[in-house]
Amino acid sequence: MGVTGVPVRPRDAASLVLIRDGRRGVEVLMGRRRPKAAFIPDAYVFPGGRVEPDDRRAVPAAPLTAETAARLGDAAMARALAVAAVRETFEETGLLLGGAGDVGSVEGPSWAAMRALGMAPALNRLSYIGRAITPTNSPIRFHARFFLAQARHAVGTLAGSGELLDLRWVTLEQARRLPIVDVTEFMLEEVGRLPGGDKPRGRAPLFSYRGNSPVVRYP
């Protein structure tokens, strides 16, 4: 809750679940949030963060597929969310899901780095898993959308910026044994239902809360 007792409005955010084929099955890339982080400190999460204004203005190398865009709804917001997922992952892990292109007139270190590579976010590589909304009693709230992509489409070397610690590839079983929150556990289950990391289809789940109890709906 906010200081007035009214629930804080959730901020739009996006996360990217990068997967690859490992020796023991599908692996996902995760990192640990810093101990002093304001939101879920010390928890292992997927790379991601809130949508920034430039995510709406950046020019992608390729658009979302029609199927993925339709599952997300509003076209402009869908693109901004997807760009944010790619940008945040690039910032936090050094891996860029990109293709040849020019990000446009947006400024900042991440965009400059993409521009130097002659690359921009390749949104066509993303599929959409689902979304989650933080409980109303939390002082920090997000409306997070979770995307999925194959790591083989990313370029770069795994090297964090320091925002996420202990970046590592783990199997789904190993990930469930890490300190994770319920939303992360749910998204891992969704990934586990996909044969060989196939693209999610059908109605996307919404993970939210009624009071402090998790509720999953398929609106």
Residue map of PLM features:
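N-terminal leader/linker segments that precede catalytic domains of diphosphate-processing enzymes
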Residues: 1-219
